[in-house]
UniProtKB/Swiss-Prot annotation:
Cysteines joined through disulfide linkages: C56-C68, C57-C66, C62-C69
GO CC terms, sorted: extracellular region
Family membership: Belongs to the conotoxin M superfamily.
UniProt cross-references to Pfam families, sorted A to Z: Conotoxin (PF02950)
UniProt entry tagged with the keyword Magnesium: no
UniProt keyword annotations, A-Z: Disulfide bond, Pyrrolidone carboxylic acid, Secreted, Signal, Toxin
UniProt domain comment: The cysteine framework is III (CC-C-C-CC). Classified in the M-1 branch, since 1 residue stands between the fourth and the fifth cysteine residues.
Organism: Conus litteratus
Signal peptide annotation: 1-24
Proregion span(s): 25-54
Name recorded for this polypeptide: Conotoxin Lt3.4
Localisation: Secreted
Length: 70
């Protein structure tokens, strides 16, 4: 009887839950699809603004953890 309960629980509860798409995944996918429609100049503008936001260390405090010094 226990085996049948485990089997029913697996197929009636766990298996259907694995088939649902998570809501958290959908906005990211839509955002990626929207980015494919941008022209080259708009994509370059987004990339350059993201690169400018990166912080760099000063030369006095440069060590192996700082990526801009190397």
């Amino acid at each position: 009887m226990l085996k049948m309960g485990v089997l029913l629980f697996t197929f009636l509860v766990l298996f259907p839950l694995a088939m649902f798409q998570l809501d958290a995944d959908q906005p990211v996918e839509r955002y990626a699809e929207n980015k494919q429609d941008l022209n080259r100049d708009e994509r370059m503008k987004i990339m350059l603004s993201a690169l400018r936001q990166r912080q760099c260390c000063d030369w006095e405090w440069c060590d192996e953890l700082c990526s801009c010094c190397w």
